Amino acid sequence: MVTPQHAQELSTGARELGIDLSEAQHEQLLAYLALLIKWNKAYNLTAVRNPDEMVSRHLLDSLSVVPFIEGTRWMDVGSGGGMPGIPMAILFPERNISLLDSNGKKTRFQTQVKLELKLDNLEVIHSRAENYQPDVPFDGIISRAFSSLEDFAGWTRHMGDVNTRWLAMKGLHPADELVALPSDFHLDSAQALTVPGCQGQRHLLILRRTA
């Protein structure tokens, strides 16, 4: 159940992140949270079981990457419960956001969210990353707790080109993973993120293809 405390935490946290949510966006994010809480009991969408932790660890964590979203077509790989792709679709109705996951339960949940929240800019794809072939390269490809940087780059290489930005949301700065980055990728920048209500470290690594 979504409480007034959750609503206040979302409003305050978004402001701390420099994001001015409209009333409609605030309501949509809370409606998404309500669906996540409801479906998580049966579908195991997230390891976070306590609804009181979901605003910071899911919604605000997803919103923390908003300043780094450029371009019109984005892919959220291994989206799971829809993070960060669904919050991105709510914040950016003018952008096309695709969610990709190989787990049928999770894509069914994502489809339900799309229908209930009327997110016409959201596409749900049930597939493994290496098997999905887009018609044109994405402007950006993002993942949150999906895999190692090596696998993230390797499994999604074909979805982008030299103009694409790969955004990997991580906890601790993964220096060991950067060493194993495929030779045709390089680190463009690394950002330390501060997420309201989250105690642990958060980092965003932005990768580019060199060829």
UniProtKB/Swiss-Prot annotation:
Record GO terms (molecular function): rRNA (guanine-N7-)-methyltransferase activity
GO cellular component term, pick one: cytosol
Main location as per UniProt: cytoplasm
Localization, UniProt: Cytoplasm
Recorded catalytic activity of this chain's protein: guanosine(527) in 16S rRNA + S-adenosyl-L-methionine = N(7)-methylguanosine(527) in 16S rRNA + S-adenosyl-L-homocysteine
This enzyme's EC code(s): 2.1.1.170
Any Pfam family: GidB
Keyword Methyltransferase part of the UniProt annotation: yes
Residues binding S-adenosyl-L-methionine: 78, 83, 129-130, 144
Keywords attached to this entry: Cytoplasm, Methyltransferase, rRNA processing, S-adenosyl-L-methionine, Transferase
Annotated PANTHER family: S-ADENOSYL-L-METHIONINE-DEPENDENT METHYLTRANSFERASES SUPERFAMILY PROTEIN
Family: Belongs to the methyltransferase superfamily. RNA methyltransferase RsmG family.
Cited function: Specifically methylates the N7 position of guanine in position 527 of 16S rRNA.
HAMAP family: 16SrRNA_methyltr_G
Protein name: Ribosomal RNA small subunit methyltransferase G
Upper taxonomic lineage: Bacteria, Pseudomonadati, Pseudomonadota, Gammaproteobacteria, Pseudomonadales
